[in-house]
Protein backbone atom coordinates (compact mmCIF):
# COMPACT_ATOMS: atom_id res chain seq x y z
CA UNK A 1 0.00 0.00 0.00
CA UNK A 2 1.47 3.32 -1.06
CA UNK A 3 1.57 6.14 1.41
CA UNK A 4 2.10 9.77 0.69
CA UNK A 5 4.71 11.76 2.52
CA UNK A 6 5.02 15.51 2.71
CA UNK A 7 8.34 16.64 4.15
CA UNK A 8 8.11 19.10 7.00
CA UNK A 9 11.63 20.42 6.46
CA UNK A 10 13.84 20.68 3.40
CA UNK A 11 17.61 21.21 3.42
CA UNK A 12 19.34 22.73 0.40
CA UNK A 13 23.04 22.02 0.13
CA UNK A 14 24.09 25.26 -1.56
CA UNK A 15 24.27 25.29 -5.35
CA UNK A 16 20.95 25.94 -7.04
CA UNK A 17 20.78 26.03 -10.82
CA UNK A 18 18.94 29.32 -11.20
CA UNK A 19 20.04 32.61 -12.73
CA UNK A 20 20.92 34.57 -9.61
CA UNK A 21 20.34 35.30 -5.96
CA UNK A 22 16.99 37.08 -6.43
CA UNK A 23 15.68 34.21 -8.55
CA UNK A 24 16.82 31.66 -5.95
CA UNK A 25 15.20 33.47 -3.04
CA UNK A 26 12.02 34.17 -5.00
CA UNK A 27 11.56 30.78 -6.65
CA UNK A 28 12.79 28.51 -3.88
CA UNK A 29 11.49 30.64 -1.04
CA UNK A 30 7.95 30.74 -2.45
CA UNK A 31 7.96 27.06 -3.49
CA UNK A 32 9.20 25.66 -0.19
CA UNK A 33 8.03 28.34 2.24
CA UNK A 34 8.14 27.36 5.89
CA UNK A 35 9.66 23.97 5.08
CA UNK A 36 12.96 25.84 4.68
CA UNK A 37 14.64 26.55 7.99
CA UNK A 38 17.57 28.08 6.09
CA UNK A 39 18.19 29.09 2.49
CA UNK A 40 21.46 29.49 0.57
CA UNK A 41 21.94 32.09 -2.15
CA UNK A 42 22.44 29.34 -4.75
CA UNK A 43 26.16 30.05 -5.27
CA UNK A 44 25.65 32.06 -8.46
CA UNK A 45 28.12 33.65 -10.85
CA UNK A 46 31.78 32.82 -10.26
CA UNK A 47 30.89 30.53 -7.33
CA UNK A 48 28.70 28.33 -9.54
CA UNK A 49 31.52 25.80 -9.91
CA UNK A 50 32.04 25.46 -6.17
CA UNK A 51 35.71 26.18 -5.34
CA UNK A 52 36.89 26.98 -8.88
CA UNK A 53 36.64 30.71 -8.22
CA UNK A 54 39.46 30.31 -5.70
CA UNK A 55 41.95 29.10 -8.32
CA UNK A 56 42.84 32.58 -9.68
CA UNK A 57 43.40 33.76 -6.09
CA UNK A 58 45.75 30.86 -5.39
CA UNK A 59 47.44 31.14 -8.78
CA UNK A 60 48.21 34.83 -8.19
CA UNK A 61 49.77 34.17 -4.78
CA UNK A 62 53.50 34.94 -4.67
CA UNK A 63 53.87 31.92 -2.38
CA UNK A 64 52.64 29.42 -4.99
CA UNK A 65 53.53 28.48 -8.55
CA UNK A 66 52.40 25.92 -11.10
CA UNK A 67 54.03 22.58 -10.36
CA UNK A 68 57.08 22.13 -12.63
CA UNK A 69 55.80 18.66 -13.59
CA UNK A 70 52.96 20.30 -15.52
CA UNK A 71 50.47 18.05 -13.72
CA UNK A 72 46.79 18.93 -14.10
CA UNK A 73 43.93 18.19 -11.70
CA UNK A 74 41.91 15.66 -13.68
CA UNK A 75 38.53 16.94 -12.53
CA UNK A 76 39.12 20.61 -13.36
CA UNK A 77 41.95 20.65 -15.85
CA UNK A 78 43.72 23.32 -13.79
CA UNK A 79 47.51 23.10 -13.44
CA UNK A 80 48.37 21.91 -9.93
CA UNK A 81 50.08 24.46 -7.71
CA UNK A 82 52.97 23.96 -5.32
CA UNK A 83 55.07 26.09 -3.02
CA UNK A 84 57.10 28.64 -4.94
CA UNK A 85 60.83 28.06 -4.94
CA UNK A 86 62.42 28.94 -1.61
CA UNK A 87 59.08 29.46 0.20
CA UNK A 88 58.67 27.79 3.58
CA UNK A 89 55.29 26.69 4.93
CA UNK A 90 55.30 29.28 7.73
CA UNK A 91 55.76 32.09 5.17
CA UNK A 92 52.58 31.32 3.21
CA UNK A 93 49.66 33.67 3.76
CA UNK A 94 46.46 34.57 1.98
CA UNK A 95 44.42 37.75 2.09
CA UNK A 96 40.71 38.09 1.45
CA UNK A 97 39.16 34.96 -0.05
CA UNK A 98 35.90 36.60 -1.15
CA UNK A 99 33.43 34.48 0.81
CA UNK A 100 32.57 37.18 3.36
CA UNK A 101 32.13 39.79 0.63
CA UNK A 102 29.78 37.49 -1.30
CA UNK A 103 27.85 36.58 1.85
CA UNK A 104 27.31 40.20 2.85
CA UNK A 105 25.98 41.08 -0.60
CA UNK A 106 23.68 38.08 -0.74
CA UNK A 107 22.45 38.75 2.78
CA UNK A 108 21.11 42.13 1.63
CA UNK A 109 19.22 40.30 -1.14
CA UNK A 110 17.96 37.82 1.47
CA UNK A 111 16.61 40.66 3.62
CA UNK A 112 14.84 42.19 0.61
CA UNK A 113 13.32 38.81 -0.31
CA UNK A 114 12.14 38.28 3.26
CA UNK A 115 10.64 41.80 3.34
CA UNK A 116 8.77 40.99 0.08
CA UNK A 117 7.47 37.76 1.59
CA UNK A 118 9.43 35.54 -0.81
CA UNK A 119 11.30 34.01 2.13
CA UNK A 120 9.33 33.07 5.25
CA UNK A 121 10.01 34.91 8.48
CA UNK A 122 12.23 32.83 10.73
CA UNK A 123 14.18 31.35 7.81
CA UNK A 124 17.93 31.79 8.22
CA UNK A 125 20.41 32.87 5.57
CA UNK A 126 22.70 29.91 4.85
CA UNK A 127 26.33 30.60 3.99
CA UNK A 128 28.02 27.58 2.42
CA UNK A 129 31.79 27.39 2.80
CA UNK A 130 34.22 24.75 1.60
CA UNK A 131 36.59 23.30 4.13
CA UNK A 132 40.09 24.68 3.65
CA UNK A 133 41.31 21.16 2.84
CA UNK A 134 38.75 20.89 0.04
CA UNK A 135 40.10 24.01 -1.67
CA UNK A 136 43.78 23.26 -1.21
CA UNK A 137 43.43 19.59 -2.16
CA UNK A 138 41.57 20.60 -5.33
CA UNK A 139 44.36 22.82 -6.62
CA UNK A 140 47.68 21.92 -4.99
CA UNK A 141 50.11 19.03 -5.25
CA UNK A 142 49.67 16.33 -2.62
CA UNK A 143 53.22 16.89 -1.36
CA UNK A 144 52.48 20.55 -0.50
CA UNK A 145 48.90 20.34 0.82
CA UNK A 146 50.05 20.10 4.44
CA UNK A 147 52.31 23.14 3.98
CA UNK A 148 49.71 25.35 2.26
CA UNK A 149 46.46 24.39 4.01
CA UNK A 150 47.17 26.04 7.43
CA UNK A 151 47.57 29.47 5.81
CA UNK A 152 44.35 29.03 3.87
CA UNK A 153 42.61 27.87 7.06
CA UNK A 154 43.68 31.11 8.80
CA UNK A 155 42.31 33.15 5.90
CA UNK A 156 39.04 31.20 6.00
CA UNK A 157 38.76 31.80 9.75
CA UNK A 158 39.01 35.54 9.05
CA UNK A 159 36.24 35.18 6.45
CA UNK A 160 34.01 33.42 9.00
CA UNK A 161 34.76 36.13 11.56
CA UNK A 162 33.68 38.82 9.07
CA UNK A 163 30.53 36.91 8.16
CA UNK A 164 29.61 36.55 11.83
CA UNK A 165 30.34 40.22 12.45
CA UNK A 166 28.14 41.48 9.61
CA UNK A 167 25.21 39.05 9.64
CA UNK A 168 23.14 38.77 12.83
CA UNK A 169 23.52 35.35 14.38
CA UNK A 170 19.74 34.99 14.59
CA UNK A 171 19.65 35.14 10.77
CA UNK A 172 22.79 33.11 10.05
CA UNK A 173 23.49 29.46 9.35
CA UNK A 174 26.96 28.36 8.24
CA UNK A 175 27.33 25.06 6.42
CA UNK A 176 30.74 23.51 5.83
CA UNK A 177 30.89 21.69 2.51
CA UNK A 178 33.08 18.61 2.68
CA UNK A 179 33.70 17.19 -0.78
CA UNK A 180 36.15 17.36 -3.65
CA UNK A 181 35.30 18.46 -7.18
Predicted ranges, named:
Residues 1-155, 161-172, 176:
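Alpha/beta catalytic barrel-like cores
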Amino acid sequence: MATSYTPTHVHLVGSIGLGGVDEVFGTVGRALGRRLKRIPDGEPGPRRLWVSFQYPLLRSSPFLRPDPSGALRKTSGFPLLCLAEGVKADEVEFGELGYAREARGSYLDFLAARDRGDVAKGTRFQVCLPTPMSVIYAFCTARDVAAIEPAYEKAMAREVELICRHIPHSDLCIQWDVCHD
